[in-house]
């Protein structure tokens, strides 16, 4: 697209959209935010006023049918990602969609199919951002043989974890009707791991909802179908195996850390005082040492810049393309299937 002004409609103005996507898009030269549709006309009007967006729409479909709008940014909960993405692509609009990609892999494949049917349009999923400063360095270390062949991945994800909060309020992330097969932070960490060592070939999972029910706004007790503690075992496609433990209900738990163990070395990405750091060591070393990351390898958040550049034809989408996003949705589906059946699941599940 070579036009000077790219007009973007915002559909769903949640916290990340207001914090990241709206200001990020407004910072791009030649971009105009022309409309916003949130969950109600009142909230749409409020967001439009707060962020200087031209018009508040009554419904997201009003943005889809507006021929003056070139692209949409979708910041809704996952249950609407597929219907809005597909409708926008069919209407000839470029799409930037918040993560997680969809409710499940079937929806993800439908989104990918709609995008492939319209190769002139850009479709991008917001990437897992937490490892961006480290990704290129880890990729280079693995590719250059720093760990040799992959033996094992040990991932402990406890960000935000505490003893069970029995009186905590329901959240959309606990609601399978809104969140689908996405569970806690497992998807964003698997997406990061795929950048480093590729996808899994098999999945076996066990888990539970320790907080089994919560009270909704009316005081009614409702079940929590999404686990707050899971352990996932995988065989990796390139060899080696993975053990990932994710929880929000472990009191006094160690900080989040992910280690790649190889035949010749080890890489560890670990959280301390809320910040991630990178360490590595090789055969013969007595301990892991901090990795000095070259300035040119320090990645960061540039989602909106990448999207607009892709729309203008000056950059290809890498963070994240729909093919990659479908792979993490297939893995999430496999985790849920294994949780349900107690059996191992082979990937890919759909072709």
What are these regions (language model features)?
Residues 1-51:
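N-terminal Rossmann-like dinucleotide-binding module
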Residues 1-5, 71-74, 109, 116, ...:
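C-terminal helix-rich "cap/oligomerization" subdomain common to oxidoreductases
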Residues 2, 71, 77-78, 82-130, ...:
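Beta-strand-loop-alpha-helix segment that lines the small-molecule cofactor/substrate pocket
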Residues 16, 39, 294-305, 320:
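Active-site loop of classical SDR/Rossmann-like NAD(P)-dependent oxidoreductases
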Residues 17, 57, 97, 103, ...:
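Hydrophobic residues in well-ordered beta-strands that form the structural core
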Residues 53-59:
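Conserved SAM-binding strand-loop segment of SAM-dependent methyltransferases
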Residues 121, 129-222, 342:
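Predominantly a Rossmann-like dinucleotide-binding segment in NAD(P)-dependent oxidoreductases
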Residues 184-185, 190-275, 304-310, 314-315, ...:
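Contiguous beta-strand/loop segments that form the cofactor/metal-binding neighborhood of enzyme cores
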């Amino acid at each position: 697209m070579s036009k000077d002004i790219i007009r973007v409609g915002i559909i769903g103005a949640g916290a990340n959209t207001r914090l990241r996507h709206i200001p990020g898009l407004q910072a791009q030269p030649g971009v105009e935010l022309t409309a916003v549709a949130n969950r109600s006309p009142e909230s749409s009007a409020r967001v439009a006023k707060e962020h200087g967006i031209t018009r508040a729409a009554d419904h997201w479909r009003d943005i889809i049918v507006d021929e003056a709008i070139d692209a949409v940014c979708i910041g809704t909960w996952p249950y609407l990602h597929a219907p809005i993405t597909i409708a926008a692509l069919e209407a000839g609009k470029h799409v930037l969609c918040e993560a997680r990609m969809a409710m499940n892999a079937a929806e993800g494949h439908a989104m990918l199919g709609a995008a492939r049917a319209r190769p002139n349009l850009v479709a991008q999923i917001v990437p897992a951002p937490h490892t961006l400063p480290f990704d290129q360095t880890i990729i280079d270390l693995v590719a250059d043989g720093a760990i040799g062949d992959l033996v094992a991945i040990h991932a402990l994800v406890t960000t935000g974890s505490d003893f069970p909060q029995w009186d905590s309020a329901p959240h959309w992330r606990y609601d399978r009707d809104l969140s689908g097969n996405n569970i806690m932070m497992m998807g964003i960490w698997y997406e990061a791991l795929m950048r480093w060592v590729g996808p899994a070939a098999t999945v076996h999972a066990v888990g539970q909802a320790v907080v089994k029910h919560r009270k909704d706004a009316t005081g009614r007790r409702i079940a929590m179908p999404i686990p707050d503690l899971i352990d996932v075992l995988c065989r990796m496609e390139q060899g080696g195996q993975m053990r990932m433990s994710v929880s929000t209900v472990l009191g006094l738990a160690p900080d989040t850390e992910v280690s790649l163990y190889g035949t010749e070395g080890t890489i560890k990405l670990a959280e301390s005082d809320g910040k991630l750091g990178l360490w590595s060591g090789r055969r013969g070393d007595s301990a892991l040492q901090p990795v000095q990351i070259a300035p040119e390898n320090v990645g960061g958040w540039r989602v909106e810049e990448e999207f607009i550049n892709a729309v203008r034809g000056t950059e290809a989408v890498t963070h994240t393309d729909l093919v990659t996003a479908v792979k993490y949705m297939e893995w999430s589906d496999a985790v849920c299937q294994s949780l349900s059946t107690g059996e191992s699941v082979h990937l890919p599940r759909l072709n």
